[in-house]
């Protein structure tokens, strides 16, 4: 019985440490050399690629057409995200360990933050942020309402949330 209790305690501590270490860094999405309609960003763990479907826009602020391509360097897996709304170019973040990609997706008046497993493209967590200003930083997720400007700092009401749900195990 002590062995079982010890195993549960170790699992709990491991999950708690994972949640506590859940931080995301914004990924700069830039034009890819040699391919005028491809944009992407990368770090040592993962590469994220978008296709720009508008040949007249060489500096898009969003990518309206799936898929998004993920190349996970740690596992060697590549995958495609086929579902999604419009992906915001400035709304792509990577987890510190490279296992999660967090993206801002929107369509019409609805908006979500969605995290994906970088090796499988499975959804880890999604959060509806419709009608709110948002920011991801070292302190977590900040959501603002009653805003006078475009940034979350212009909001009269700001709620802080943990990023831990975005780092959990991918949903099946």
UniProtKB/Swiss-Prot annotation:
Record has Signal as a keyword: yes
Pfam families xrefs: Tsi1
Database matches in Gene3D superfamilies: 2.40.128.650
Bridged cysteine pairs (disulfide): 22-167, 79-121, 147-155
Keywords (A to Z) from UniProt: Disulfide bond, Signal
Segment forming the signal sequence: 1-19
Protein function: Immunity protein that plays a role in preventing early activation of toxin Tse1. Binds to a large surface of Tse1 and thereby occludes the active site to specifically inhibits enzyme activity by forming a hydrogen bond with the catalytic diad.
Assembly, per entry: Forms a heterotetramer with Tse1 consisting of two Tse1 dimers and two Tsi1 dimers. Formation of the complex inactivates Tse1 enzymatic activity.
This protein's name: Immune protein Tsi1
Originating gene: tsi1
